[in-house]
């Protein structure tokens, strides 16, 4: 054990760093230059791809040469194709059959992201004979096990469900594993799958396994995971150069400063005016999403909702419905923020501010994706939150201030309050939404920016349709042991 530790430390010094210059002329960006197999090339042409993104041009050749890769790639850079093409080519060249079991495993943090990758796999493998499948939490475990026993050559999985099958599904053959992909590694660890990942890496064979790990942000935990999963001396590909901004280049980004009581009115006016566009609105809690979605649908502004309290089938249906729509509004929590490739989104609205610059970068990664992506992003800030801009500036995120003429803001406050008062169901969801907003606010990690005691609760309540703040209980702190009663505009701690 000590021996491997030492040799790994030594080999890390040999790690090769490739800084990608987006305009680099020394790299051929055509897919034809990769000498891909006939079935793969047919699929790529059918999908309408001809040129690689910078991430793909830098990553695919070394991966096809069998190198282990640690990729720092920002969301929307085309990394899904970057790891799928080499792994599919590997299965093809080894002539994998169902009886050989699983040759490639792709681990990804959320069910939505897994479905997303699986959709691309299905298109890319249309003309191949190899089998592919997906195992995710929330799906039917028995059906998954039956498929695994028949032999799934390329498997897309979320960590918890994968570990379950590795430990408990008899007849799941993975001894011939040739490639492991860990996508959105930082997110997998953030959600709390560190232990599962360690166990998975222990169980999987690593004799002649090629591994690749992708992460939008590099943290010590990501480094630890790469140390145990990659072979010594991986190729480190950084496609975010030092002077580069952290968000995709075709993205116009702005913020608007708005008092708490005017937030909903401004959002409503904006959505009403942009009904022909495709828009995603981010909120900080499931209950807020439920409330605003119910409300907007009730007042004839049709929206879709996506959040963690929905059943998996509902989330999947909603996601694909929004993907296939030419226009529409999706209201969601951060569960949908990472890596979901929703085509041609015109606007990202961050109605509740993100916890830190990394969340911001991942949220706006939904628009301006791929080689020629264009999109706009708008973040709502109350005056007390302007300090967040300093953090974004430090994270190299360029922002402009937008102003909205007050006479263009629909004053529907009195109608909103009447509706919330008279409709019992909406009144309840509004109260839950209000409570969850405060709860999420209290749990923000940037305490210097998001100070719950500075919130004007009367104004916050107005944005949920209450003329006077309702009494709600919230718990502050991860332990949940500090009950806090929020009443009128004071916060009493017991």
UniProtKB/Swiss-Prot annotation:
Keyword Hydrolase annotated: yes
GO biological process per UniProt: maturation of LSU-rRNA from tricistronic rRNA transcript (SSU-rRNA, 5.8S rRNA, LSU-rRNA); maturation of SSU-rRNA from tricistronic rRNA transcript (SSU-rRNA, 5.8S rRNA, LSU-rRNA); snoRNA release from pre-rRNA
Gene encoding the protein: HAS1
SMART domains per record: DEXDc, DUF4217, HELICc
Motif Bipartite nuclear localization signal: where in chain: 262-278
Domain Helicase ATP-binding: 60-236
Motif Q motif, chain ranges: 29-57
Protein name: ATP-dependent RNA helicase HAS1
GO cellular component: nuclear envelope; nucleolus; preribosome, large subunit precursor; small-subunit processome
Sequence positions that bind ATP: 73-80
Keywords: ATP-binding, Helicase, Hydrolase, Nucleotide-binding, Nucleus, Ribosome biogenesis, RNA-binding, rRNA processing
Subunit organization: Associates in the nucleolus with the 60S and pre-60S ribosomal subunits.
Record remark on domains: The Q motif is unique to and characteristic of the DEAD box family of RNA helicases and controls ATP binding and hydrolysis.
Top class in the EC scheme: hydrolase
Keyword rRNA processing listed: yes
Pfam family, any one: Helicase_C
Family: Belongs to the DEAD box helicase family. DDX18/HAS1 subfamily.
Example GO molecular function: RNA binding
Motif (DEAD box): 183-186
Subcellular location, record wording: Nucleus, Nucleolus
Source organism of this protein record: Candida glabrata (strain ATCC 2001 / BCRC 20586 / JCM 3761 / NBRC 0622 / NRRL Y-65 / CBS 138)
